[in-house]
Amino acid sequence: MSGKGKSAGADKASTSRSAKAGLTFPVGRIHRLLRKGNYAQRVGSGAPVYLTSVLEYLTAEILELAGNAARDNKKSRIIPRHLQLAIRNDEELNKLLGDVTIAQGGVLPNIHQNLLPKKSGKGDKASQEL
């Protein structure tokens, strides 16, 4: 006897926790990292699923915005500059990742208002002539 009960012949392939939750990121790996990281003595079964879904959502959001930035610059490959532009131009992501430095990200283009050339109106020429 194999000890599998009545359905000894019908072996079903195991389904991963990522597939059960409908996620792409690995739930098992996140669970292992939570256990090995000494964050708590015990880790519940729902915590890694929730954390994995949050990580997957944030990654998808950042990559979508970075892809839009790459397309705006007529590029087909996302580089750190596109990630920087995507994060800094989004209010919520900028608040979340405000203290993060992205290597090779550059800075946002910003010219102070006082340094811009003044717009000359029609009455300016008469006032400057003496």
Swiss-Prot record:
Similarity comment: family membership: Belongs to the histone H2A family.
Domain notes: The [ST]-Q motif constitutes a recognition sequence for kinases from the PI3/PI4-kinase family.
Compartment annotation: Nucleus; Chromosome
Domain of life (superkingdom): Eukaryota
Miscellaneous comment in the UniProt entry for this protein: In contrast to vertebrates and insects, its C-terminus is not monoubiquitinated.
GO molecular function, one term: DNA binding
Subunit details: The nucleosome is a histone octamer containing two molecules each of H2A, H2B, H3 and H4 assembled in one H3-H4 heterotetramer and two H2A-H2B heterodimers. The octamer wraps approximately 147 bp of DNA.
Alphabetized PANTHER family for the sequence: HISTONE H2A
Phosphoserine modifications at: 127
UniProt xrefs under SUPFAM superfamilies: Histone-fold (SSF47113)
UniProt keyword list: Acetylation, Chromosome, DNA damage, DNA repair, DNA-binding, Isopeptide bond, Methylation, Nucleosome core, Nucleus, Phosphoprotein, Ubl conjugation
Modified residues (N6-acetyllysine): 4, 6
Residue numbers carrying N5-methylglutamine: 104
CDD domains referenced in this protein's UniProt entry, alphabetically: HFD_H2A (cd00074)
Short motif ([ST]-Q motif): ranges: 127-128
Site (Not ubiquitinated): 118
Biological-process GO terms, alphabetical: DNA repair
Organism: Meyerozyma guilliermondii (strain ATCC 6260 / CBS 566 / DSM 6381 / JCM 1539 / NBRC 10279 / NRRL Y-324) (Yeast)
Cross-link (Glycyl lysine isopeptide (Lys-Gly) (interchain with G-Cter in SUMO)): 125
Protein name (record): Histone H2A.2
GO cellular component term of the entry, any: nucleus
Known function: Core component of nucleosome which plays a central role in DNA double strand break (DSB) repair. Nucleosomes wrap and compact DNA into chromatin, limiting DNA accessibility to the cellular machineries which require DNA as a template. Histones thereby play a central role in transcription regulation, DNA repair, DNA replication and chromosomal stability. DNA accessibility is regulated via a complex set of post-translational modifications of histones, also called histone code, and nucleosome remodeling.
Record-linked InterPro entries: Histone-fold, Histone_H2A, Histone_H2A/H2B/H3, Histone_H2A_C, Histone_H2A_CS
PTM characteristics: Phosphorylated to form H2AS128ph (gamma-H2A) in response to DNA double-strand breaks (DSBs) generated by exogenous genotoxic agents and by stalled replication forks. Phosphorylation is dependent on the DNA damage checkpoint kinases MEC1/ATR and TEL1/ATM, spreads on either side of a detected DSB site and may mark the surrounding chromatin for recruitment of proteins required for DNA damage signaling and repair. Gamma-H2A is removed from the DNA prior to the strand invasion-primer extension step of the repair process and subsequently dephosphorylated.
